[in-house]
Each structure stands twice: as C-alpha cells, then as structure tokens.
Curated annotation (Swiss-Prot):
Role summary: Negative regulator of GDH1, the activator protein that regulates the ubiquitin ligase activity and substrate specificity of the anaphase promoting complex/cyclosome (APC/C), and which is required for exit from mitosis, cytokinesis and formation of prereplicative complexes in G1.
Any GO MF annotation of the entry: ubiquitin-protein transferase inhibitor activity
Protein name (Swiss-Prot/TrEMBL): APC/C-CDH1 modulator 1
Quaternary structure and interacting proteins, as annotated: Interacts with CDH1, BMH1 and BMH2.
Domain of life (superkingdom): Eukaryota
Listed Gene3D superfamilies: 6.10.250.2450
Record PTM Phosphothreonine, positions in chain: T161
Induction: Expressed very quickly after G1 release, just prior to initiation of DNA replication.
Organism: Saccharomyces cerevisiae (strain ATCC 204508 / S288c) (Baker's yeast)
GO biological process: cell division; negative regulation of protein ubiquitination
Note: Present with 688 molecules/cell in log phase SD medium.
Residues covered by region (Disordered): 1-38
Modified residues (Phosphoserine): S48, S202
GO CC term, one of those recorded: cytoplasm
Amino acid sequence: MISPSKKRTILSSKNINQKPRAVVKGNELRSPSKRRSQIDTDYALRRSPIKTIQISKAAQFMLYEETAEERNIAVHRHNEIYNNNNSVSNENNPSQVKENLSPAKICPYERAFLREGGRIALKDLSVDEFKGYIQDPLTDETIPLTLPLGDKKISLPSFITPPRNSKISIFFTSKHQGQNPETKISRSTDDVSEKKVVRKLSFHVYEDE
C-alpha cells in the first residue's frame, strides 16, 4: 500500500533580518514583580507583633573578688603540680641518663676501674648456690642433682659403651686402671668428688673378670 503523499515546501533561504516571534506567556507563569514583593514585606513588618524588651536597672554582672583562703588553696595546688612535674625525668634534660647512650659515657668512672684490673675472674658455679632437681613423674619425688665428679676419670669395663654425650663422656674412659694411672675404678657413680655435677647413671659399673 502506498502512503499518501504529503506536500512539502521547497527549501528556501532564510531572511536573517526577520525577527523571531516573541513567546507569549500566560499571567499564571509570570513571576511577581520586585515592587510587589517590597510592598508585601513592608506590610508584613507593620502587622507583625513586636516584643517589647524592658531594660533592667539592676547590675548585669558582678565583679568576683578572691578571698585569702581561696588564694592560698590555688598557690598550694600550683606548687604540688610544679613539684610533680620536676620529679618526672625530663627526656630533653642532657644530665639525665639516656636509654641508647653508650655505657662508656654513662659511667666513665666504672670503666676506668675496670681498666685497672678490678674485674673478677670466671669460675665454676657453686652447686649449693645453684641447685638442680629432677622429679619422678610417677611418684612426684624431687631428687636434687648433687652428684659431682672429681679430677680423675671413671674407668668403664670393655663391655660397657661410654656415654655419647660430649659433656658427660669426658668424665669416663674405657682404659684399664693399670694402663691409665689417672683413672680410678668405680662400681657405681656414688663415690665421686663434690666439685662438679652430672646426671647419675641408671646402672652399676662392674670390673672385667
């Protein structure tokens, strides 16, 4: 079906001197004039109630005068705060000991004393002062570790393997008494000196037959 033909005007040039038609607006879309707004504002101000403020003849404020007792309390409180602040170490005070300061700068007199040979030589710890204990997990019995070893090594029979712990094996040897006179024969670890402490063996030591 062929659509009805619609008449269209031929495109022509537009006259630039022709003014466009002014858009006519209705009265309901017009904004009120400035004069009308000013009249409404003046009318509202004249008709609005105005609150009357009565000026009081009494004094609006009173000067505060500090008494002698209040002055003494204030001075005493100020002195307490000042003394508390002075008692706290000031981190900006150069005379205070700093946390990361070198020990040589903190105690120069003690360092000079160490240079003069005032240090104490190292020695073995006392067994009586530094005691050790072991506890039986079944009976909860606490046994002190007071089993020391002497200067001589303990001779073990050939059928007994010496302890593999390097801290304990230095006190035992597999050589016979005649081959090494510095050793001593022991049937247990109970007959040892009281200078050093080691763990007590759980077996008895017998000589070769």
